[in-house]
């Protein structure tokens, strides 16, 4: 029988000093011997997805106490990718994932906590906590802050948009046809409430995936931050973590541990969900890194295989202007998408979750498109936006009058009515990316699925943005942004501004963008990222010259630089004769010691850009 980890500091004569300190936090004699649950909060006033989390750790702690445990809260950092976007702040976003993972590990292990609740929400916080949970492998439950409501009606260039988001504001900012007054209206409407940005961007994608992988409760990925129904997720997370902690420590039931829940079959299901819902390309980085922490042999080849057989069942912003997360919720949330995949025979059924003994039980109870969903599930998915600007959680009780169960033309479709027969994410290979690169096919216009054009080469995101705004990029071009990978950036910046500004200039369907950096979950269009190997590691992208023809064929999963091999060989010889080969020729970019430390240990995007620490 495993012993409570916390006994190390709560039992025995020599731990009198530690117990004295525990007592100073409010613990009593009755608490020693109960499971101590670490509550990793990520409240910050910098991030709308986290601004409302301040008191929610206490809500979890109260539920932990009621269930027979002792909750102790701490905080991690949280970077807002949208605020950090388009300047040097974005260099810190991906590296913050590793810092968050380390911070959770440090706090949990330093204080010998027995179990963990992760209160996450935005882009790198959920992945960072997921890495930590799989690394620690103690009973863990995730509960996120929830999605933001979509921005409401505005007119852009004479067209009324019933729902808008952050990306609409970014695109409008570079559109000369949008007046300052119109832009101000869009800006003020785009982000109306607390919560993670309202589309199927990185934050919401990852929160949906923690639900699919079995470490979060049903409804976690889609229940709005502002809705009163979300309160029960925090209470239930506190109760559930104590239940599974007791099953492990009192019953030696290892099936409740994160690595048993998030096993290979669960990862495959998570990827199936990801490609079915057209999730952010960043999810691939994070799932690869998480699989490594779980000690699973799971790589881009596995993701590629799944993406070829799983259809795209949902197109949510930025892949469609019609739907946001509030619409996914009305359609039954993640259980509805999983239910459609299960009925199509596309899920591994031999999985379980922290809340259910089997996938069959899980979906029977929570899939509102099935015939046995519980009243609790039906009630939850009626939760609707409040339509009021607020930073307060649980502040609306609005309800949809009906659910969207239209599998033929609704927000979530069945296999027979899928948007495409293969998934919303794809892995491409070729001489430009022998280790692979990633494209969100759900956001690519059909006429752009095959594309060829001359390269316009930039050695920083800043130079590319300047060129786009100066109208130097024209229809038919392939914009190549290199030396922005994990090592070359360092930090693997997101390229949301270049893609948004291309759209704002009317080039969203006329150009391709290729980078060894990455893209925001808000990106759509022919945007290909994670080119591996990256330029700084000697990848072929470092040898591309202006005017070179690049050929992209998404249906056949290929990407090629159409330059003769002998010419490329000569370019490589010249590159390696430089004083500092595989570095930008003229870029001036301050790089701090913290970023240099990340760069020195960062692996390729094809490995998840995790930090490889020497033995």
Curated annotation (Swiss-Prot):
[2Fe-2S] cluster binds at residues 122, 197. Coiled coil: none annotated. SUPFAM superfamilies: IlvD/EDD N-terminal domain-like, LeuD/IlvD-like. Binds 1 [2Fe-2S] cluster per subunit. This cluster acts as a Lewis acid cofactor. GO terms for biological process: isoleucine biosynthetic process; L-valine biosynthetic process. Pathway: Amino-acid biosynthesis; L-isoleucine biosynthesis; L-isoleucine from 2-oxobutanoate: step 3/4; Amino-acid biosynthesis; L-valine biosynthesis; L-valine from pyruvate: step 3/4. Disulfide bonds: none annotated. It comes from the Bacteria. InterPro entries: Dihydro-acid_dehy_C, DihydroxyA_deHydtase, DiOHA_6PGluconate_deHydtase_CS, ILV_EDD_C, ILV_EDD_N, IlvD/EDD_N. Mg(2+) binds at residues 81, 123-124, 494. Homodimer. This is Dihydroxy-acid dehydratase.
């Amino acid at each position: 029988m495993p012993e409570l980890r916390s006994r190390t500091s709560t039992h025995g004569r020599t731990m009198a000093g530690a117990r004295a300190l525990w007592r100073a936090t409010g613990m009593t004699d009755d608490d020693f011997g109960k499971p101590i649950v670490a509550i990793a909060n990520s409240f910050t006033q910098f991030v709308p997805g986290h601004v409302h989390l301040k008191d929610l750790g206490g809500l979890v702690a109260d539920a932990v106490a009621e269930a027979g445990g002792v909750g102790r809260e701490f905080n991690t950092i949280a970077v807002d990718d949208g605020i950090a976007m388009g300047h040097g702040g974005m260099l810190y976003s991906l590296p913050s994932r590793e810092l968050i993972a380390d911070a959770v590990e440090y706090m949990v292990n330093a204080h010998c906590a027995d179990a963990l609740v992760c209160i996450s929400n935005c882009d790198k916080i959920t992945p960072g906590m997921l890495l930590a949970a799989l690394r620690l492998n103690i009973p863990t439950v995730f509960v996120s802050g929830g999605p933001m409501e979509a921005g409401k009606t505005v007119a852009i260039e004479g067209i009324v948009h019933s729902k808008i988001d952050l990306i609409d504001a970014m695109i409008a900012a570079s559109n000369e046809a949008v007046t300052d007054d119109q832009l101000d209206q869009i800006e003020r409407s785009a982000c109306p409430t607390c919560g993670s940005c309202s589309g199927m961007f990185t934050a919401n994608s990852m929160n949906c995936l923690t639900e699919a992988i079995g470490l979060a409760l049903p409804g976690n990925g889609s229940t709005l931050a502002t809705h009163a129904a979300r309160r029960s997720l925090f209470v239930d997370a506190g109760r559930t973590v104590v239940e599974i902690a007791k099953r492990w420590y009192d019953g030696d039931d290892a099936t409740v541990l994160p690595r048993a829940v998030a096993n290979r079959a669960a990862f495959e299901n998570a990827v199936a969900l990801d490609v079915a819902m057209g999730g952010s390309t960043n999810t691939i980085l994070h799932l690869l890194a998480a699989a490594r922490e779980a000690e699973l042999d799971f790589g881009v080849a596995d993701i590629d295989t799944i993406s070829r057989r799983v259809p795209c069942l949902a197109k949510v912003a930025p892949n469609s202007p019609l739907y946001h997360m509030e619409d996914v919720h009305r359609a039954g949330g993640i259980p509805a998408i999983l239910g459609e995949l299960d009925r199509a025979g596309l899920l591994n059924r031999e999985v379980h979750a922290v809340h259910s003994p089997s996938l069959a039980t899980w979906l029977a109870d929570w899939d509102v498109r099935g015939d046995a969903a519980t009243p609790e599930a039906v009630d939850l998915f009626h939760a609707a936006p409040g339509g009021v600007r607020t930073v307060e959680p649980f502040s609306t009780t609005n309800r949809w009058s009906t659910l969207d169960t239209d599998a033929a033309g609704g927000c979530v479709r069945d296999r027979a009515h899928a948007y495409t027969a293969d998934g919303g994410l794809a892995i491409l290979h070729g001489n430009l990316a022998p280790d692979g690169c990633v494209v969100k096919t759900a956001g690519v216009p059909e006429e752009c699925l095959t594309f060829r054009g001359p390269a316009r080469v930039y050695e920083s995101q800043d130079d590319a943005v300047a060129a786009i705004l100066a109208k130097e990029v024209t229809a038919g071009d392939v914009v190549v942004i290199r030396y922005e990978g994990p090592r070359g950036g360092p930090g693997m910046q997101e390229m949301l501004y270049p893609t948004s500004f291309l759209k704002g200039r009317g080039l969203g369907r006329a150009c391709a963008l290729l980078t060894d950096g990455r893209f925001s979950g808000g990106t759509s269009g022919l945007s290909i990222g994670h080119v591996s190997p990256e330029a700084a590691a000697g990848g072929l992208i470092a040898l591309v010259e202006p005017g070179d023809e690049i050929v992209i064929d998404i249906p056949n999963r290929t990407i090629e630089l159409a330059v003769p091999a002998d010419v490329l060989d000569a370019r490589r010889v010249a590159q390696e004769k430089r004083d500092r080969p595989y570095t930008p020729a003229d870029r001036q970019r301050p790089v701090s010691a913290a970023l240099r430390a990340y760069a020195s240990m960062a692996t390729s995007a094809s490995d998840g850009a995790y930090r490889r620490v020497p033995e």
